[in-house]
Amino acid sequence: MYKFCANALKVILSLRGGVKVYNKENLPADSGFVIACTHSGWVDVITLGVGILPYQIHYMAKKELFQNKWIGSFLKKIHAFPVDRENPGPSSIKTPIKLLKEGEIVGIFPSGTRTSEDVPLKRGAVTIAQMGKAPLVPAAYQGPSSGKELFKKGKMKLIIGEPLHQADFAHLPSKERLAAMTEALNQRIKELENKLDQL
């Protein structure tokens, strides 16, 4: 179902020029990984999924969306899994860590600007990557952020950064490691956004 939906969306997006993807070779080919991409609307979630095909991403989605049996069933088929955003706890990271250890890809979408939600999400991406012993890949998207904007002119650009590897931070104590990796992620995402402005 995931592959079918992603390829169908790829065809639809191609009608407006498609998605230009830069540095796709930065995606790890030999392990699962966390990909943290800038977020301004639902379009960037779709763009990331289409842009890195044939890789398939597992997404976090708020648990309320799964309360409807049919919607919940569809979301599971396209690799979404429920998370309690109001009361996040240890159970919120069990699923993504398990997926990483199975060699799968987990997508997390901190916003592009430093909002109150942004820093915890980046820290969450780092925590999941560390506990899953997986690389953390920064990414940035630039283009339409809503369905209304999607059918207007304007490029859709996605850029993939070089992965952050756990080994590069292993010399630090655990608390410092979390802070250092979060700051490194933030810095790389900023650099990617600046590069997109020039492309």
Swiss-Prot record:
GO terms for cellular component: plasma membrane. Pfam families: Acyltransferase. Disruption phenotype: Cells lacking this gene cease to produce phospholipid and accumulate fatty acids arising from the dephosphorylation of 1-acylglycerol-3-P. Pathway: Lipid metabolism; phospholipid metabolism. GO terms for biological process: phosphatidic acid biosynthetic process. It catalyses: a fatty acyl-[ACP] + a 1-acyl-sn-glycero-3-phosphate = a 1,2-diacyl-sn-glycero-3-phosphate + holo-[ACP]. A motif (HXXXXD motif) lies at residues 39-44. The keyword NAD does not apply. It is found in: Cell membrane. It is an enzyme of class 2 (transferase). Keywords: Acyltransferase, Cell membrane, Lipid biosynthesis, Lipid metabolism, Membrane, Phospholipid biosynthesis, Phospholipid metabolism, Transferase. GO terms for molecular function: 1-acylglycerol-3-phosphate O-acyltransferase activity. InterPro entries: AGP_acyltrans, Plipid/glycerol_acylTrfase. Its EC number is 2.3.1.n4. Converts lysophosphatidic acid (LPA) into phosphatidic acid (PA) by incorporating an acyl moiety at the 2 position. This enzyme utilizes acyl-ACP as fatty acyl donor, but not acyl-CoA. Belongs to the 1-acyl-sn-glycerol-3-phosphate acyltransferase family. The HXXXXD motif is essential for acyltransferase activity and may constitute the binding site for the phosphate moiety of the glycerol-3-phosphate. This is 1-acyl-sn-glycerol-3-phosphate acyltransferase. It comes from Bacillus subtilis (strain 168). The lineage of its organism: Bacteria, Bacillati, Bacillota, Bacilli, Bacillales. The gene is plsC.
